[in-house]
């Protein structure tokens, strides 16, 4: 079992690691995109301990809600629980460390299909009021959505940042420069997260240099601001996208069943008609002169 101070130290250390280069930050965002329901600090610690994790939950949730047992010897992922007056550790386990028992379930993880992209694009246009020129394809729409989220909440995201820059590379920058770089870095980070979770390749649109200013956020005190902002904005958008994808997937499944039933019905009617025709031929062949004078 880990100690509280050990995990606090891990968070501090890993913050300096993922902010040390654009590539390290992008690797972190890949994990954050899969675990978008978690807040930044949890995403940070999960990435530090299990960067390939896909679905994490507590032992109780796996056992009681999903009827999945945690594998013997599996090591829990230690997170900081600050919901109580005194900070303590809590543990989650990745789905790879579990197995189903009788009645066990696998959590639903939505996947956007290529054939669903146009429908999602139209949905984003409607929800975020995107203009047609900003939504030529899904990638454009996700970038426009990222920009929308930043402009709507920038002051809230930045609130307090300038008070904790001491000892970081941000300390030497003017407030206007910090604001401008923060806006740009946050927009690109949100887009990367959205695109990654939607199955697009962010690097078809972006390049590593888009994240060059992440190196200015070289301590947990300042990285928390860009991390929290990215996490909160991405979660808001991805929760909505997930619900939309789930809904249209169910509609497609229902339509597929209806089409299948209709095909079976038509096939059945065809077989009945063919059977009647065959019976008529048999009768005609068996009694060819019955009605002849």
Which stretches of residues belong to each language-model region?
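N-terminal accessory/interface modules of nucleic-acid-binding and processing proteins
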Residues: 1-293
């Amino acid at each position: 079992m880990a100690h509280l101070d050990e995990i606090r130290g891990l968070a501090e250390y890993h913050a300096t690691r993922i902010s040390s280069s654009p590539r390290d930050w992008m690797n972190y965002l890949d994990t954050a995109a899969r675990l978008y329901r978690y807040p930044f600090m949890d995403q940070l610690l999960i990435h530090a301990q299990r960067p390939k994790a896909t679905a994490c939950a507590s032992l109780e949730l796996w056992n009681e809600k999903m009827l999945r047992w945690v594998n013997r010897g599996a090591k829990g992922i230690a997170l900081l629980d600050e919901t109580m007056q005194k900070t303590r550790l809590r543990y989650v386990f990745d789905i790879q460390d579990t197995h189903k028992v009788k009645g066990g379930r696998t959590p639903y993880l939505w996947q956007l299909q290529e054939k669903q992209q146009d429908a999602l694009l139209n949905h984003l246009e409607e929800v975020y009021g995107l203009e047609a020129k900003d939504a030529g394809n899904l990638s454009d729409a996700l970038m426009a959505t990222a920009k929308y989220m930043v402009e709507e909440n920038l002051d809230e995201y930045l609130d307090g940042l300038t008070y904790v820059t001491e000892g970081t590379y941000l300390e030497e920058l003017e407030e206007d420069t910090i604001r401008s770089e923060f806006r740009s870095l946050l927009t690109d980070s949100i887009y990367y997260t959205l695109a990654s979770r939607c199955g697009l390749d962010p690097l078809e649109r972006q390049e590593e240099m888009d994240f060059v200013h992440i190196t200015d956020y070289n301590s947990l005190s300042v990285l928390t601001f860009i991390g929290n902002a990215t996490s909160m904005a991405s979660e808001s958008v991805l929760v909505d996208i997930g619900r939309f994808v789930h809904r249209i997937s169910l509609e497609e499944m229902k339509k597929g069943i209806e089409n299948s039933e209709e095909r079976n019905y038509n096939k059945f009617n065809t077989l009945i008609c063919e059977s009647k025709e065959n019976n008529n031929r048999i009768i005609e062949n068996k009694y060819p002169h019955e009605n002849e004078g």
